[in-house]
Amino acid sequence: LAQADRAGNLNVSRFGSRLAGAGGFINISQNAKKVVFAGTFVAGNLQVDVADEKLKIISDGDRPKFIDAVDQITFSGAVGAQSGRTILYVTERCVFRLSKKGLMLVEIAPGINLQKDILEKMKFTPLMAEKLLMMDARIFRPEAMGLKEDLLTLPIAERFTYQPEENLFFVNFEGLSIRSIEQIDEIREHVERICR
């Protein structure tokens, strides 16, 4: 994440007069079902610390990455927005989501001042989510985040899909382990509700 602009365009290939090239970046970012760009919010001498589940900026970078227009478009925000995919821009202090109208600020790190640490460090004003969320507090703790459960577990309610126009009922039991009568009852309730 070298540069991003209000439209969600991203430059990861050109740094001043130096052309680094995009490698497989374009193929991956254009074909992934969900795209998460990650990098620091600013460049140059950034020093941060995490204490008491909050992010503290010790020394802020002196080169903004969120600018009016990127020097070179390696990822097109307009094309990405039209694709309907989830596209996120994650930094140490905030998270943006690409919308059809451009970059939208959706999350902020605990300990960060919206005006001083984010908006004043950008060369444009981003769209703002109706409700600005706090980034997951687990990020700012020293222990492991416990992502296995989040990433690999599909809740029972999300394992059933009914398509009424074709009268098709899909059930996804991939990776499911039944360990209790309560789980069986929950499955029965969902199936009965959908099939009524």
Spans of features found by a protein language model:
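A structural preference for short, pocket-lining loop segments at secondary-structure junctions
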Residues: 194-196
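Long, compositionally biased
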Residues: 146-153
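STAS-typified acidic loop motif
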Residues: 156-192
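Conserved phosphate- and dinucleotide-binding cores of soluble alpha/beta proteins
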Residues: 1-143
